Amino acid sequence: MNLHEYQAKQLFAEYGLPVPEGFACDTAQEAFEAAGRISTDKKVVKCQVHAGGRGKAGGVEIHDTKDGVKEFAQKWLGKNLVTFQTDAKGQPVTKILVEEASNIANELYLGAVVDRATRRIVFMASTEGGVDIEKIAEETPELIHQAAIDPLVGPQPYQGRELAFKLGLVGDQIKQFVKIFLGLGNMFAQYDLALLEINPLVVTAEGNLLCLDGKINIDSNAMYRQPKLREMHDPSQEDEREAHAAQWELNYVALDGSIGCMVNGAGLAMGTMDIVNLHGGQPANFLDVGGGATKERVTEAFKIILSDTNVKAVLVNIFGGIVRCDLIADGIIGAVEEVGVKVPVVVRLEGNNAPLGSKKLAESGLNIIAATSLTEAAEKVVAAAEGK
């Protein structure tokens, strides 16, 4: 789960980290009033969406007047912002962040991720702030400095000082950086974060550090024990189909192809997508119905797949272990009858009660194409999607 910039800065402030004074606004009038409460002559206004590249897309501007701030809010609230990280539809703008402008002398980068190889939280810092860190890692990796956090003792001041020295910070800036480093390290562990970025972490003209932007991603598997962060969830930023799938405990990711896939098990789902691609098709989605598939969940899975107008055929690939193939067959039949499936459906069942499931499908009288192997299923669904 991702947080908006204003939400990330709220968490930063709770840990005593320096952030610009700002207000998240739902209406243009609120933005106008917020601009009046900010002491600096210039105000920065930012569209709040879960995507980067807002500035280049016109979603970040600097204004000298309250009226300019209000006009910006009127322009964007209720609209979609399209950036290089969104699809063609873009992300809806429901909040505008109005905050004080800062005099920037230097831009740094500070971020943290979970390194699965070392099983540690690893901090990354660089003098190249304000740009894409992946680009820096690829072109000039020597400019990225790291510090691994021992989970038994947590972040240590000496690690913060080492990073500060490598970033060229001096005097009181080192003390400020250590405070930021320790706060972020404790926040990362307490809130079960998966990724944290301050890009840029700026040195102001007065020589102080300031968290000018914030990006936070939370481990979705830990949301059950993070009620505070759950309340920050913004469903408007998610794909509607993915949000619908999550309500039914279905793992769904929308893609750009024309062949809908419904599979049980993430590994088998990825293998199914690969073999569809190998035979010249393009998957329209990743969908794992899981081991506890029921007739109702299978029906909902069909509805979600078919809500994508690009889908020309559907491949159902089930290996019955925990889930029984005859129950999947009941779900397929019920879904086809309820939804009124107009596209070809190719089904491959294997494992627990597969013969009974195949028999039910054959006796249903529905236009369902049976396949006995994964290769055969891929060939048939690709041909069906092409109208052959």
Swiss-Prot record:
Record EC number: 6.2.1.5
Cofactor binding note from Swiss-Prot or TrEMBL: Binds 1 Mg(2+) ion per subunit.
Positions of Mg(2+) binding: 199, 213
Keyword entries, A-Z: ATP-binding, Ligase, Magnesium, Metal-binding, Nucleotide-binding, Tricarboxylic acid cycle
Catalysed reactions, as listed in the record: succinate + ATP + CoA = succinyl-CoA + ADP + phosphate; GTP + succinate + CoA = succinyl-CoA + GDP + phosphate
Any GO molecular function: succinate-CoA ligase (GDP-forming) activity
Keyword Nucleotide-binding: yes
GO cellular component: cytosol; succinate-CoA ligase complex
Sites where the protein binds substrate: 264, 321-323
Binding, ATP: 46, 53-55, 99, 102, 107
SUPFAM superfamilies reported for this sequence: Glutathione synthetase ATP-binding domain-like, Succinyl-CoA synthetase domains
Cofactor(s) annotated in UniProt: Mg(2+)
Domain ATP-grasp: 9-244
Known pathway: Carbohydrate metabolism; tricarboxylic acid cycle; succinate from succinyl-CoA (ligase route): step 1/1
InterPro entries documented for this protein: ATP-grasp (IPR011761), ATP-grasp_succ-CoA_synth-type (IPR013650), ATP_grasp_subdomain_1 (IPR013815), Succ-CoA_synthase_bsu_CS (IPR017866), SUCC_ACL_C (IPR005811), Succ_CoA_ligase-like_bsu (IPR005809), Succinyl-CoA_synth-like (IPR016102)
Functional description taken from the UniProt entry: Succinyl-CoA synthetase functions in the citric acid cycle (TCA), coupling the hydrolysis of succinyl-CoA to the synthesis of either ATP or GTP and thus represents the only step of substrate-level phosphorylation in the TCA. The beta subunit provides nucleotide specificity of the enzyme and binds the substrate succinate, while the binding sites for coenzyme A and phosphate are found in the alpha subunit.
Subunit text: Heterotetramer of two alpha and two beta subunits.
Family from the record: Belongs to the succinate/malate CoA ligase beta subunit family.
Protein name in UniProt: Succinate--CoA ligase [ADP-forming] subunit beta
Name of the gene this protein is made from: sucC
